[in-house]
C-alpha cells in the first residue's frame, strides 16, 4: 500500500518560489496564514498540486486582500475587505452548498480541507515595479480558484 505524502508549506518570504508551466491544475488545501505587506493585510492560502506529473506536490499560494483581526500569523483571523471581493466569491464557487454567511469574519476555512479544486496557475514575470524578472527569478502563483474538481 502506498504511503500518503505530507506536503509541508515552509515557504519563507526569502525562499525562491516554485515555477511550473502555466495552466489549470487540481490542487488541495494545505494551510493558511495572514500577514502584512506594503501596509496592507493579506491572506495567503497554500495549496498542493495533486495532478500526476512534473508539478506533483508543488506548493503554490493564493493571496487575498483582507483585514487582519488581531495578530497576523499562521491560522490568523481575518475578514475579507468586502462581501464581493475575490475570497468570498471563490469560496462560494468552490463550496456552492455552503450556507450563506452573515458576517464576513465567519468564513469557515475548515471547508477547504474537504475537496480538490481547479486552479488557474500563472507565471509572475514582472516585479513590483513592473520590470521584467529574469527567467531564473520567475515563479508560479494561483491567480484564481475555478471551483471544485471532485464534483
Region locations from a protein language model:
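Short beta-rich binding modules
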Residues: 1-151
Amino acid at each position: 500500500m502506498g504511503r500518503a505524502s505530507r506536503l509541508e508549506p515552509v515557504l519563507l518570504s526569502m525562499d525562491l518560489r516554485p515555477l511550473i508551466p502555466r495552466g489549470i491544475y487540481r490542487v488541495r488545501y494545505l494551510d493558511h496564514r495572514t500577514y502584512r505587506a506594503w501596509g496592507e493585510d493579506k491572506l495567503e492560502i497554500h495549496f498542493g498540486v495533486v495532478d500526476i506529473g512534473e508539478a506533483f506536490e508543488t506548493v503554490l499560494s493564493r493571496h487575498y486582500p483582507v483585514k487582519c483581526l488581531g495578530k497576523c500569523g499562521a491560522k490568523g483571523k481575518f475578514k475579507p475587505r468586502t462581501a464581493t471581493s475575490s475570497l468570498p466569491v471563490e469560496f462560494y464557487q468552490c463550496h456552492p452548498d455552503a450556507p450563506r454567511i452573515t458576517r464576513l469574519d465567519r468564513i469557515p476555512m475548515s471547508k477547504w480541507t474537504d475537496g480538490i479544486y481547479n486552479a488557474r496557475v500563472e507565471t509572475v514575470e514582472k516585479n513590483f515595479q513592473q520590470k521584467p524578472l529574469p527567467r531564473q527569478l520567475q515563479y508560479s502563483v494561483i491567480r484564481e480558484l475555478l471551483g471544485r474538481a471532485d464534483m
